[in-house]
Structures are given as structure tokens and as C-alpha cells.
């Protein structure tokens, strides 16, 4: 849970990864937003363009990890901390965004 991973919030979904409690990522503190900007990479460990360099990965939510507004990003972003049990399982219903029984969290 406290394993440091400076790349956990990177990618085009960087901001959702930092701000979505179900994304599998978190910041060390509320003042550390990990990301350089909305769409750029988060801290790389060098501190360039970042407030802090200690971005950490949170323990993914144990249920409903791919649901909500960021459902697609959570299911498709390898850095999101979530995964689907199979490639054909999108985890969430795109219409009402309800939880799927087969949704799983990645380790």
C-alpha cells in the first residue's frame, strides 16, 4: 500500500488517477497533486515540474474499482490500479455505470 511508485499517476489519465479515489493511485498528501498538469506525466522522481517527488500508489478499492465517471480510464489505463477479469469484460455498464460482479482490482 505504501510502495513508492513515481509513475503511478502518469499517462493521459494522470489527473483522474490522482484525484479519483477508485483509481488505485494517491498522493502523499493533499497538497501533493503528483501531476505536472491535467494531461502531462506525474512526478518522475527528479522533481522537474512537480510540487513533490513522493507520489505513491494507493491500495485499489476492493469493490467497484472500475465504476463511476472514470470507468473507462480505470479499465483501460494500465497505471490506474484496476483491471477487468477478461478483455471482453468492461467492468461497468456504460449506460448506468453500475458495478459488475466480475470486476476485479489489479495487484
UniProtKB/Swiss-Prot annotation:
Keywords for the protein's UniProt record, in alphabetical order: Cadmium, Metal-binding, Metal-thiolate cluster
InterPro entries documented for this protein: Metalthion_7 (IPR012484)
Q: What is this protein called?
A: Metallothionein-1
* Single GO MF annotation: cadmium ion binding
Record lineage: Eukaryota, Sar, Alveolata, Ciliophora, Intramacronucleata
> Does this entry carry the keyword Secreted?
no
Record function comment: The metallothioneins are involved in the cellular sequestration of toxic metal ions. Binds 12 cadmium ions per molecule.
Which residues, by range, are in coiled-coil regions?
A: none
State the similarity comment: Belongs to the metallothionein superfamily. Type 7 family.
Is the keyword Metal-binding in the record?
yes
Amino acid at each position: 500500500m505504501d510502495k513508492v511508485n513515481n509513475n503511478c499517476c502518469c499517462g493521459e489519465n494522470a489527473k483522474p488517477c490522482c484525484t479519483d479515489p477508485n483509481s488505485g493511485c494517491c498522493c502523499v498528501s493533499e497538497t501533493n497533486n503528483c501531476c505536472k498538469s491535467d494531461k502531462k506525466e506525474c512526478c518522475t522522481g527528479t522533481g522537474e515540474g512537480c510540487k513533490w517527488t513522493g507520489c505513491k500508489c494507493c491500495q485499489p478499492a476492493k469493490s467497484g474499482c472500475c465504476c463511476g465517471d472514470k470507468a473507462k480510464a480505470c479499465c483501460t489505463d494500465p497505471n490506474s490500479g484496476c483491471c477487468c477479469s477478461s478483455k471482453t469484460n468492461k467492468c461497468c455498464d456504460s449506460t448506468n455505470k453500475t458495478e459488475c460482479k466480475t470486476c476485479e482490482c489489479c495487484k
